[in-house]
Amino acid sequence: DLMGLILLIVCILIILIFLKDYIRLGGKKTTINKKQKMIVYEVHQNNKRIQQGWITDDQLPFQFGRNAGSGNDVVVVPEGTPADEAASVSRAWFYIQKDALGNYMVYSAELSGDGKKRQSEKKKLVVENGNTWKAMHTVKLQSEVRLKADQFQVILDVENPGES
């Protein structure tokens, strides 16, 4: 009888711990801390959405998606992040919300002959305050992308940036 009671208490505690985490995660999605920059992202592969989610700026660098490990990979990181700390991706769409103002770096990495990644180029991504404005385009490296963020989400499309 005592063992059964102890087991029941342990089970209830485990359920409560999981519920607490679930409620906290759910609460995060609805109440965004205004001081944090939010990046909501979608990963598409072969014109199909394979992943969707969101991150805060303190979770960068962040890998959006990978296309069979081929070259021309890209990642978005906070400005000033060293290249060797940046993960890399080959294709991504991401949305910048109105609180995500600031500067970011976009890194491009290519596979070298021995199959190891090396940094090839980087560019600056600037998110500014502005009126309703939506951008969707292929990133060209060695240039600066300026986006205006507002209550509508801004889309940046990154696809095979090594090709120009």
Can you say where each PLM-predicted feature lies in the sequence?
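Intrinsically disordered, low-complexity acidic Ser/Thr-rich regulatory segments
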Residues: 1-86, 139-164
